[in-house]
Amino acid sequence: MSSQAKVLLVNGPNLNLLGRREPGHYGHHTLEQIVSDLQQQAADANLQLEHIQSNAEHLLIEAIHNTDADFVIINPAAFTHTSVALRDALLGVAIPFIEVHLSNVHSREPFRHHSYFSDKAVGIICGLGAQGYQFALQSVIAQLKASQQK
């Protein structure tokens, strides 16, 4: 990529507890480890990565409203199943996004099967643990390169 593109990484409620919260579902990586790995992957691709994690929906919405990112990677966590407001924020800024989930939401409780985001996402990655974030960023890098070649 010729100029430095920007990606906003959004992590929703309770993801600050990664590494100690239900490791059978979410793995042993902490959020700090995941973000650090992504920062390195982004730097290697000459990409700027901004990150926000919050348990407060309005802070995530404000971060999306205020970003000048070219792409969003979002793990809405529990907001996946409840937040029309967060969905509307993404649609309002019209920035493409990839939805990521550490666990396979479709093999869990029925209420986790519905997402307010999936029908608008460029792609969805679930059930691959922390590696899912890396795959999402790989996809973003490829899509940004392809858009610059047009």
Curated annotation (Swiss-Prot):
UniProtKB keywords: Amino-acid biosynthesis, Aromatic amino acid biosynthesis, Lyase
Gene Ontology BP annotations: amino acid biosynthetic process; aromatic amino acid family biosynthetic process; chorismate biosynthetic process; quinate catabolic process
Xref: InterPro entries: DHquinase_II (IPR001874), DHquinase_II_CS (IPR018509), DHquinase_II_sf (IPR036441)
Pathway terms, separated by semicolons: Metabolic intermediate biosynthesis; chorismate biosynthesis; chorismate from D-erythrose 4-phosphate and phosphoenolpyruvate: step 3/7
The keyword Cell cycle is assigned to this record: no
Enzyme class at the top of the EC tree: lyase
SUPFAM superfamilies: Type II 3-dehydroquinate dehydratase
A molecular function (GO) term: 3-dehydroquinate dehydratase activity
Active site (UniProt): Y26 (proton acceptor), H101 (proton donor)
Catalytic activity reported: 3-dehydroquinate = 3-dehydroshikimate + H2O
Entry's EC annotation: 4.2.1.10
Record site: Transition state stabilizer: R21
Residues given in the record as substrate binding sites: N75, H81, D88, L102, S103, R112
Entries under Pfam families matching the protein: DHquinase_II
Function: Catalyzes a trans-dehydration via an enolate intermediate.
NCBIfam families: aroQ (TIGR01088), PRK05395.1-1 (NF003804), PRK05395.1-2 (NF003805), PRK05395.1-3 (NF003806), PRK05395.1-4 (NF003807)
Oligomer and partners: Homododecamer.
Family per similarity comment: Belongs to the type-II 3-dehydroquinase family.
Protein name: 3-dehydroquinate dehydratase
Species assigned in the record: Shewanella piezotolerans (strain WP3 / JCM 13877)
Gene: aroQ
